[in-house]
């Protein structure tokens, strides 16, 4: 009888943990909203480019307007880390059958004290899954950006960017784009390119990104 009771308790605990996990998938509601918004914009008959990643992508509100000759979908979700993108890869990227995808992750990972090697491993898994699903897909890794509020982590961000760059050198159809140094004035961070929180960019900041990324977006 005691054994039966123990099994019952364990079973209830397992069900409770499982139910909690099902109810707390990070960003599930936000991702669903992103999908609904982009589904209403997406023309499946046209070539598609997807920009995805954390809030630096999400807040790029005029992304499509900057590239009017391309169909560009923005599936960025604020506060995300590379593991979150990996979890939602099907809905945020593969669903739209893109020929190119631009990824910005790693910024929040470093802030949350994840080591660069761990972020790189997750990024490699993202790339592997994307290439497995769409072998001809072109993938562009956008470097971690500098910012006022996270400037003290610059050493870790620079190490992460070097790892991204080396990964891109090793794999076909994978490019690395550096936005770090264009956002500096010499060795100093430009402070006129951020909004008041010191983390996210204003229009001038996105002007820099546009100039750096334009050739990758517009390349056939």
Describe the function of each predicted region:
Residues 117-126, 156-161:
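Charged helix-capping and loop-helix junction motifs
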Residues 148-220:
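Catalytic His-Asp segment of secreted/periplasmic serine-dependent ester chemistry enzymes
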Residues 42-45, 66-67, 95, 132-133, ...:
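Extracellular/periplasmic catalytic domains that process cell-envelope and extracellular macromolecules
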Residues 37-40, 88-95, 129-130, 216:
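A generic secondary-structure signal
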Residues 56-66, 71-73, 82-120, 140, ...:
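Oxyanion-hole/transition-state-stabilizing segment in secreted/luminal serine hydrolases
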